[in-house]
């Protein structure tokens, strides 16, 4: 896993946790939770790829890992749409920068997960 991506996740999560978006704070908390879940999933896939022959362990631990992979891509798409919506509706420059960085990070993580999953297939 790229150390830049780790710091990006931490930075974006920290920035998002400081935002006050009024009535949509529940939505923001949901986004933060999804980001954290996505980071953990991406990390576990990356670790599985790093260990040779770990595909069997991954399949044994989670027989439906391909289904789970599909669900994670759905979560990424949902997060991308949510971040795009927040980006369009906010006028605060701090929030705009944060959401632009979050969007970029989501695209990077989606690509990393695709790469990891192709290596495991």
Curated annotation (Swiss-Prot):
It is found in: Virion; Host nucleus. Keywords: Host nucleus, Host-virus interaction, Transport, Virion. It holds the Pfam family Flu_NS2. Its main location: virion. InterPro entries: Flu_NS2. The keyword Ribosomal protein does not apply. Belongs to the influenza viruses NEP family. Interacts with protein M1. May interact with host nucleoporin RAB/HRB and exportin XPO1/CRM1. Average number present in a viral particle is estimated to be 130-200 molecules. This is Nuclear export protein. The lineage of its organism: Viruses, Riboviria, Orthornavirae, Negarnaviricota, Polyploviricotina.
């Amino acid at each position: 896993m790229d150390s830049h991506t780790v710091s990006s996740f931490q930075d974006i999560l920290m920035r998002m946790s400081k935002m006050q978006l009024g009535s949509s704070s529940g939505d923001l908390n949901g986004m933060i939770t999804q980001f954290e879940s996505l980071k953990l999933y991406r990390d576990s896939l990356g670790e599985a790829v790093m260990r040779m022959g770990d595909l069997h362990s991954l399949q044994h631990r989670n027989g439906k890992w391909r289904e789970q992979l599909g669900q994670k891509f759905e979560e990424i798409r949902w997060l991308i749409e949510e971040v795009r919506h927040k980006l369009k509706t906010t006028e605060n420059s701090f929030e705009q920068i944060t959401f632009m960085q979050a969007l970029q990070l989501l695209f990077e993580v989606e690509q990393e997960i695709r790469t990891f999953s192709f290596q495991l297939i």
